[in-house]
């Protein structure tokens, strides 16, 4: 168990005021945690399942690039970590809870905010941890995530540019429906959208709460960046996902369904229909 609180009183109040629909700029005490230094992360990468490691070239990427078009860097993931200050790349360590030490860290941090979260969206489900190791000026293109997320900055600095979940110009229903049917999460980009962004910059000791499904893109600043991302789902998020699958099913039958609802409106009827059809093998 962690001896000290990760979040101070101000951070708890900021998260409570924003969760679940709005982003929040928070402070935290994890910046000097030994599990987040580069030596520890290089060691973690050697213990992880290969399929939970990702890396690619990441400097000067177009914001609307697809996963399939993202360039490789010609290095192994371990060499990329060793040369991260010079190789213009990005490394993602996924599902870090597969390692007992990082699983304990994740549980302890999320347990601290569980009472706040659970009184709003119910139990924290499918908790996962991710670590991003990025070269200076690395770009993470525009995308959305199916989880609630707190991004903790441990080294270097970066800016996240967030957009509203309900902005149909940026993230129409078709993107949700495609993603929950197995499609990509990256989104196309138009330059005129830049003025709609809510940019939040973080340095070590700061964090961002990223709302479920909120489109965002990220760029690191002049130094190597290390960020810890802790995520969770809720019953509402799973109902939304299944409702998106049901809408896609209806479109294939020639029906134009109403869009899935945004929190706090639920999507249970469509969700239960999708689950019933899935059980029947449809």
Where are these predicted regions, by residue range?
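A gly/proline- and charged-residue-enriched helix-loop-helix capping module
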Residues: 97-131
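Short glycine/proline-enriched turns and hinge-like loops at secondary-structure junctions
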Residues: 143-146, 153, 163, 220-223
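Active-site-adjacent segment of 2-oxoglutarate/Fe(II) JmjC oxygenases
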Residues: 191-195, 200, 241-276
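Double-stranded beta-helix
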Residues: 153-209, 214-215
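A short beta-loop-beta micro-motif enriched in histidine and acidic residues
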Residues: 126, 139-149, 195-196
């Amino acid at each position: 168990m962690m001896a000290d609180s990760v979040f101070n009183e101000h951070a708890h109040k900021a998260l409570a005021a924003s969760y679940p629909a709005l982003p929040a700029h928070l402070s935290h005490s994890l910046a000097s945690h030994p599990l987040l230094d580069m030596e520890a992360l290089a060691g973690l990468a050697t213990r992880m399942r290969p399929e939970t490691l990702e890396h690619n070239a990441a400097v000067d990427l177009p914001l609307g690039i697809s996963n399939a078009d993202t360039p490789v860097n010609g290095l192994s993931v371990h060499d990329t970590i060793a040369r991260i200050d010079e190789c213009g790349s990005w490394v993602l360590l996924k599902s870090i809870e597969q390692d007992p030490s990082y699983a304990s860290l994740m549980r302890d941090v999320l347990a601290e905010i569980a009472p706040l979260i659970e009184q709003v969206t119910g139990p924290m489900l499918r908790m996962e941890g991710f670590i991003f190791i990025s070269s200076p000026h690395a770009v993470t293109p525009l995308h959305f995530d199916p989880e609630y997320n707190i991004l903790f900055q441990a080294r270097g600095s970066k800016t996240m540019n967030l957009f509203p979940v309900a902005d149909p110009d940026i993230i129409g229903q078709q993107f949700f429906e495609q993603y929950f049917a197995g499609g990509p999460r990256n989104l196309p980009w138009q330059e005129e959208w830049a003025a709609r962004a809510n940019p939040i910059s973080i340095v070590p000791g700061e964090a961002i709460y990223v709302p479920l499904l909120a489109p965002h893109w990220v760029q690191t600043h002049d130094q190597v960046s290390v960020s810890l991302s802790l995520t969770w789902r809720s019953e509402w998020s799973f109902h939304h996902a299944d409702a998106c699958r049901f809408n896609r099913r209806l479109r294939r039958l020639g029906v134009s369904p109403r869009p899935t609802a945004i929190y706090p409106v639920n999507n249970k009827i469509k969700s239960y229909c999708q689950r019933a059809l899935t059980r029947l093998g449809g």
